[in-house]
A protein has these predicted regions:
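Secreted, disulfide-rich extracellular signaling modules
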Residues: 2-550
Length: 550
C-alpha cells in the first residue's frame, strides 16, 4: 500500500510539472515561429555526452499482469527461459443445482491466444501477435493445491499479497512445485499453438445434423475428461470435485471455494534446450474458461402425465482471481557476469544488454562529465542563466532526442521494434510520453513521436545500421526551464509501450520497478554503450536549439 501511495503522489506531482512545462513550451513555440529564419537567430545542434551501464532485472511482481506468458524461449545470446503460470478460478454461479441422475459429459478448458484478425473477401485470417519462437514445447496442466491468498497476513490491514516471478511471496515463502503439481489433467509432449479459428457445433434435432453455432478466435482448447491421448484424470475425478458437491458449503461462496479448488497450474518445458516458443494468453477474455458439461433428468408434465427428459447443463469457471507467472532462467554465465559487474557504472559500459522478463536493462545519465571536466551544471548553463531564483533562457530547445545503435553482430535476429525510456528515480514515464497522443495510449502501436520504432540508416558506403530514437524535448525543457532534477533514466525492451504500469522488484535497491510491457516479452537486443569501441555508434543526446547571434 505504501508503494502504491508513493507512486500516486509522484504521478500527481509529475502531472503538475508537466502542465506548467507544456504551457511554457506553447509560448516558446510561438516565439520560435517568429525567430526562425531571421538574421538575429539561428538553429544549431550539438551532441551532449551521456553515460550508460547495465543492470539486472531481479524478480518482480508477477501476479495479475495484463497478460500471461507461457512457454520456453531460447535466446541465442542470453540463453533459455521457461515461463509457467498458476491461476485461480471461480465459478460464475455459486450454490449451483446439478439436478438428479447427473452424468458427466465433458470438461473443456479454453484460453484464447493474444491474436489479431484481418478479413479479405469474407475470409478471416489470424496472426498471433505475441508468439515468440517456432518450435513445439512440452505442456502440462495440473490441478493446483497451493493457496493463492488475496491478503498478506504480515502486512497492514487489507495489504495485498505479492507474488514474484521467481515463485516466491513477499514473506520469502516459496511456492512449492509439489503443491502446484497435484493431479495431472493434461499433457502434450509436443505442443504448438494453431492459427486456426475454432468452430463450435450444436446438434439440430430438426435437421438431425450438427451445425456451426459459434466461432472462437485461435485458442488453447482441450478436453480434460476421457482424453487418454493427453493423460486426462481418472474416472470420477470431476464428479467428485464438483458434481457431487451440490449442497456442500465448499462451493457455496468465494472464500470457501478458492480454498477448496485452488485453480490450475500450467507448466512449460523445453523439448530441447535450444528450441521452443513462448506465447501470450488472454486470460481476461470472456471465452477463457473451464466448463463442465453434464446431463441430468428433468421431469415435465405433458397432457397431465409426468415424463422424464434428459437435459444438458454446464458449470463454468473463469480466471477471475490471482494469476502468477513463474520464470525459470538458464542464462549464459558470461553475459550475467557482464551485466552484474558494477565496477563499470562509474565510466559506463561498452555494450548495453536489454532483455525482457527476468532479464536486464540499462541506466542512462544525461550530461555526464566529459574528458575535459565539463559537468552537468556547465552543460545546463549553456541553455539558461539562474540569478536570484529567476531563470533566463539563453538557448531555446527545438528538439532533443537520444539515439541508440544496435550492435548487430552480437544481437540475435529477433530484436524488438520498440524500446521504452522512463524516469528511473520516480518510476514513472517521462513528460514526452504524456504529451505524445499518437494513436492510443494503451496500444502497442502508439507513442511514435516520442518512442520512434526501430529504423535503418544507410551510410555513405551503402552500409545499413539499425538504431532506436527517443525524443526527450519536454523532459529537457523541464530540467532547464523549471530546474527539475536531472533524474536517471531507464531503457528497456517492451512488448507494448502502452503497458506502463509498474511492477515492483522484489529487491528494490537501485531499481524500484519496471514497466509491465517489459515483463511480457522474452525478446532482447544489444546496443552500443557510451564506451563502445565503435565511437561513431556511441549513444548521443542530440539537441537542436535556437539562440541569438551576438
Amino acid at each position: 500500500m505504501k508503494f502504491i501511495n508513493s507512486i500516486l503522489l509522484k504521478c500527481t506531482c509529475a502531472f503538475s510539472v508537466i502542465a506548467m512545462i507544456h504551457s511554457c513550451d506553447n509560448e516558446f513555440s510561438e516565439i520560435g515561429t517568429g525567430i526562425v529564419g531571421t538574421p538575429d537567430f539561428e538553429i544549431q545542434n550539438r551532441a551532449y555526452p551521456i553515460k550508460t551501464y547495465n543492470k539486472r532485472i531481479t524478480p518482480f511482481e508477477s501476479n495479475k499482469l495484463e497478460g500471461n506468458l507461457l512457454g520456453f524461449y531460447h535466446d541465442p545470446v542470453f540463453g533459455g527461459s521457461s515461463v509457467s503460470f498458476v491461476g485461480q478460478m471461480t465459478p460464475r454461479d455459486y450454490n449451483p443445482t446439478f439436478g438428479t441422475n447427473t452424468v458427466l459429459d465433458s470438461v473443456i478448458l479454453t484460453i484464447p491466444y493474444s491474436s489479431n484478425a484481418s478479413t479479405l473477401e469474407d475470409v478471416t485470417t489470424f496472426e498471433l501477435d505475441s508468439l515468440y519462437g517456432s518450435s513445439p514445447i512440452k505442456l502440462s496442466v495440473f490441478k493446483n493445491d497451493f493457496l493463492l491468498r488475496k491478503y498478506d497476513p504480515s502486512a497492514a490491514i487489507d495489504g495485498a499479497q505479492n507474488y514474484y516471478s521467481d515463485g516466491s511471496l513477499s514473506s520469502g515463502q516459496l511456492i512449492e512445485s509439489s503443491a502446484l503439481e497435484s493431479q495431472l489433467l493434461y499433457y502434450n509432449s509436443s505442443y504448438f499453438p494453431s492459427l486456426e479459428s475454432i468452430e463450435l457445433e450444436t446438434y439440430n434435432e430438426e435437421s438431425e445434423a450438427f451445425e456451426v453455432t459459434n466461432t472462437l478466435n485461435p485458442s488453447f482448447r482441450v478436453h480434460l475428461h476421457n482424453n487418454s491421448d493427453f493423460l486426462s484424470p481418472p474416472e470420477g475425478f470431476w464428479e467428485d470435485l464438483f458434481l457431487s458437491r451440490e449442497e456442500d458449503a465448499v462451493i457455496g461462496a468465494e472464500d470457501s471455494f478458492i480454498n477448496y479448488f485452488r485453480g490450475l497450474y500450467f507448466k512449460a518445458e523445453p523439448i530441447t534446450e535450444t528450441e521452443g516458443h513462448m506465447m501470450q494468453l488472454d486470460l481476461l477474455s470472456n471465452e477463457a474458461s473451464l466448463v463442465v458439461y453434464y446431463t441430468y433428468d428433468q421431469i415435465i408434465t405433458v397432457d397431465g402425465e409426468e415424463e422424464t427428459s434428459t437435459v444438458q447443463g454446464n458449470y463454468e469457471l473463469t480466471f477471475s482471481g490471482n494469476r502468477v507467472n513463474i520464470f525459470e532462467n538458464n542464462f549464459d554465465p558470461s553475459i550475467l557476469q557482464t551485466i552484474n559487474d558494477t565496477s563499470t557504472d562509474l565510466e559506463g559500459d561498452d555494450y548495453l544488454y536489454l532483455k525482457g522478463g527476468e532479464g536486464s536493462m540499462a541506466v542512462i545519465e544525461l550530461f555526464s562529465e566529459d574528458e575535459l571536466g565539463n559537468s552537468e551544471e556547465d552543460y545546463l548553463n549553456e541553455f539558461r542563466e539562474i540569478d536570484g531564483g529567476q531563470t533566463t533562457v539563453r538557448r531555446l530547445i527545438n528538439e532533443a532526442f537520444l539515439e541508440f545503435y544496435v550492435e548487430e553482430t552480437l544481437s540475435n535476429s529477433d530484436i524488438p521494434n520498440r524500446v521504452y525510456v522512463y524516469d528511473l528515480d520516480n518510476n514513472i514515464y517521462v513528460a514526452d510520453y504524456f504529451f505524445d497522443q499518437t494513436v492510443n495510449t494503451a496500444s502497442a502501436d502508439s507513442k511514435y513521436t516520442h518512442l520512434v520504432p526501430l529504423s535503418t540508416e544507410t551510410d555513405s558506403e551503402g552500409v545499413q545500421h539499425k538504431k532506436y530514437k527517443v525524443r526527450l524535448t519536454e523532459h529537457l525543457n523541464s530540467i532547464i526551464l523549471k530546474d527539475s532534477t536531472n533524474v536517471k533514466l531507464g531503457i528497456v525492451v517492451s512488448s507494448n509501450v502502452g503497458a506502463v504500469n509498474s511492477r515492483k522488484l522484489k529487491d528494490a535497491n537501485e531499481i524500484e520497478g519496471i514497466p509491465s510491457g517489459t515483463v511480457l516479452t522474452p525478446r532482447s537486443v544489444i546496443l552500443h554503450g557510451n564506451n563502445s569501441p565503435n565511437s561513431a555508434k556511441r549513444p548521443k543526446l542530440n539537441i537542436y536549439y535556437t539562440e541569438p547571434n551576438n
